[in-house]
């Protein structure tokens, strides 16, 4: 009984230490590669990547630092896309197709992955961005 109370107390402490952290997870089709996306304090987008329960990429921040150009951005808010984000939505989907290359050693190529699409809003600049994570059995890719 004491163990259960300690576990509940530890869980409550961890929840208080990480307010509003909503992590989204997507696995590769075979389940070995696991990508986790989260917004850390200050609305900074981050991700981690594990392979067979071992970290491959530790927590890494995402974002774009924009060039300051007074002529190209007349009167625009030049806030970088590094922090201050809120997650507005997310969805997970699966893609699986086989295609035939024009030439090469392989007759067919399978393109099979699970995708996490995260929609973010930066209220200070009124910008919206979408980050897509494609998780394959042998790795991952991302794009803005």
Where would I find each of the regions flagged by the language model?
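Bacterial Sec-dependent N-terminal signal peptides
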Residues: 1-25
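N-terminal accessory beta-strand-rich subdomains and adjacent acidic, glycine-rich linkers
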Residues: 25-143
């Amino acid at each position: 009984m004491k163990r259960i109370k300690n576990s509940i107390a530890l869980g409550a402490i961890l929840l208080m230490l990480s307010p509003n952290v909503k992590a989204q997870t997507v696995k590769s089709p075979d389940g070995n590669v696991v990508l986790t996306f989260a917004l850390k304090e200050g609305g900074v987008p981050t991700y981690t990547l594990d392979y067979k329960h071992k970290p491959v990429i530790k927590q890494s921040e995402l974002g774009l630092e924009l060039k300051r150009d007074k002529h190209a951005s007349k009167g625009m808010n030049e806030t970088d896309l590094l922090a201050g984000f809120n997650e507005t939505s997310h969805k997970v989907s699966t893609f699986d197709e086989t295609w035939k290359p024009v030439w090469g050693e392989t007759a067919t190529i399978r393109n099979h992955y699970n995708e996490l699409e995260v929609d973010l809003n930066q209220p200070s600049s009124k910008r919206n961005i979408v980050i897509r994570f494609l998780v394959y059995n042998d790795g991952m890719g991302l794009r803005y």
